[in-house]
Amino acid sequence: FIPLLFHSIYGVIISSEARMNIGTYGTARNWFYFFQRATGIFLFVFIFFHVLNMRFGLVPGLNTTPIAGNADLSYNIVSAEFSITWVMVLYIFGVAATAWHLAYGFWLFAVDWGIVIGENAQKYALYACIALAIGLFGVGTNAAVSFVRPCGLFPKSMCEHKVETKKVSEPKRF
């Protein structure tokens, strides 16, 4: 928890000192830099909201039963929260921001630390990170929707199946 807190606070400090130049130089890297900072600030607020709401139940007008200490109620608590449209939308934005921030952070790490040096290597690493972000967004969104709708984003026909039960016959007696 402490490394995440350090990363978050340090990221907010860096973001407050950063000068955005997307108006002057609208290159993809400048936009990516902007979105990395924007998602970081959003995630700082979102994670604070998430912890207050889900762990402690301290957000007025929402869940008042904390999940901490109530593991047997956790599914019902989350399902009730995600049934509220704006909460679901907020969490989907949270999943999108997390997926982008993590995937682009991997790419920045690989470039800054000299793991991918050449222009082509950086381009393909970026493609891989974008694919990772899309995959994480899909999995995370499906998980969130699954609390409200069985099967999540998948059609019911894909996840509902009939289980054949075999009738156990009694053993033959001699």
Outline where the language-model segments fall:
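Membrane-embedded alpha-helical bundles that constitute the cytochrome b-like, heme-associated redox core
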Residues: 1-174
